[in-house]
Swiss-Prot record:
GO terms for biological process: 'de novo' pyrimidine nucleobase biosynthetic process; 'de novo' UMP biosynthetic process; glutamine metabolic process; L-arginine biosynthetic process. The gene is carA. The lineage of its organism: Bacteria, Bacillati, Cyanobacteriota, Cyanophyceae, Synechococcales. This is Carbamoyl phosphate synthase small chain. It holds the Pfam family GATase. CDD domains: GATase1_CPSase (cd01744).
Length: 384
């Protein structure tokens, strides 16, 4: 049921399917790729994850906004979603860290939201037909009129959205995870010489930077357009390739830079978009998934070991395109797509999921330790 005085809103998919509901965010019209996220928690982290740039996110969990929002859970400086779709929402959150309700937060950041939608039916449609463009409006309440706006929007395939979310200036990240968090600073790394990591920012999440800092890394974040020569001027011990939105094959500057960085043979770790860019740089290909992987309980593994992982991506590395010197370390166990790879001889590895969680499980936090060990090992070999 709508909250008293709620304004009518309309969601329409690119195939013309209408979903009438009520507004719980800003007024206006928005168009983006309609996707779904199956997580029961973490809506604030999802909305502020730059990887969701250009997307209207359907939350499958039937209640949204119960814990409000707060400054600590922001994964970037502002939300990047184009819109939010919910079954039911609350305007009166209950959580000791909450400083604002979700509807007020969306209004502040000019994000359009619609609730009262049968999100189960919508999700089943997206699973069956595939993710597609759509639009939400509080102004245009006739499906055919809104459809004209949707049809004018570009497809996610071939779209370079990294340029919209990458940093424009180089900066150093110093904040590590707090002591009261389950995964705080890593004790065995305290007191050791710091490692310099240059993070190529395709749309990096803050908790990735926190985890690197927690493992004793000095993290320098650079724009996605930074050249290999400029990166190597920092004399990094390792190079990190971040997550990000859009089609990885369209991030041409990042691919060229990564190819050139491979020649330096420095330890390299990629997450999500970074995994795809590393794969492309090693000669692989990528393809668009039918509806993507977005949620907190995606099983990944190889042989006997399984990790429950947080994922958010709509593209994947094509298994048959990998070069002989590259091996698969993980598969997504739901659909057997490539979820991790590494070079057989050189210190390059990547995963298609988010070991930093935020939100999600911490099964794969060990990958940050693996990266640190590779850097310390190479540094010791050079010094010795």
């Amino acid at each position: 049921m709508p909250i008293a005085a709620a304004k009518p809103a309309l969601l329409v998919l690119a195939d013309g399917t209408p979903y009438p509901g009520w507004s719980f965010g800003a007024d206006g019209t928005t168009v983006g790729e309609v996707v779904f996220n199956t997580g029961m928690t973490g809506y604030q982290e999802v909305m502020t994850d730059p990887s969701y740039c250009g997307q209207i996110v359907t939350f499958t969990y039937p209640e949204l906004g119960n814990t409000g929002v707060n400054a600590e859970d922001e994964e970037s400086i502002h939300p990047h979603v184009k819109g939010v779709v919910a079954r039911n929402i609350t305007r009166r959150p209950s959580n000791w860290r909450s400083t604002q309700s979700l509807p007020d937060y969306l209004v502040e950041h000019k994000i359009i939201g619609i609730y009262g939608i049968d999100t189960r039916a919508l999700t089943r449609k997206l699973r069956s037909i595939g993710a597609m463009n759509g639009g939400i409006s509080t102004e245009i309440l006739e499906p055919e009129a809104l459809l004209h706006h949707i049809q004018a929007a570009p497809s996610m395939a071939g779209l370079n959205l990294v340029k919209e979310v990458t940093t424009h200036e180089v900066y150093e990240w110093t904040d590590s995870t707090n002591d009261h968090w389950q995964f705080g600073p890593v004790a065995e790394q305290q007191g050791q010489p710091p490692l310099t990591v240059v993070a190529l920012d395709f749309g990096v999440k803050r908790n990735i930077l926190r985890r690197l800092a927690s493992y004793g890394c000095r993290v320098i974040v650079v724009p996605a357009s930074t050249s290999a020569a400029e990166i190597l001027q920092y004399n990094p011990d390792g190079i990190f390739l971040s997550n990000g939105p859009g089609d990885p094959s369209a991030v041409e500057e990042g691919i060229v830079t990564t190819k050139e960085l491979l020649a330096a043979k420095k330890p390299m770790f990629g997450i999500c978009m970074g995994h795809q860019v590393l794969g492309l740089s090693l000669g692989a290909e990528t393809f668009k998934l039918k509806f993507g992987h977005r949620g907190l309980n995606q099983p990944c593994g190889l042989e006997q070991q399984v990790e429950i992982t947080s994922q958010n991506h709509g593209f994947a590395v094509t298994e048959g395109s990998l070069a002989e010197e590259v091996e698969i370390t993980h598969f997504n166990l739901n659909d057997k797509t490539v979820a991790g790879l590494r070079h057989k001889e050189l210190p390059f590895f990547s995963v298609q999921y988010h070991p930093e969680a935020s939100p999600g499980p911490h099964d794969a936090d060990y990958l940050f330790e693996k990266f640190v060990k590779l850097m310390r090992q190479q540094k010791a070999e050079v010094a010795g």
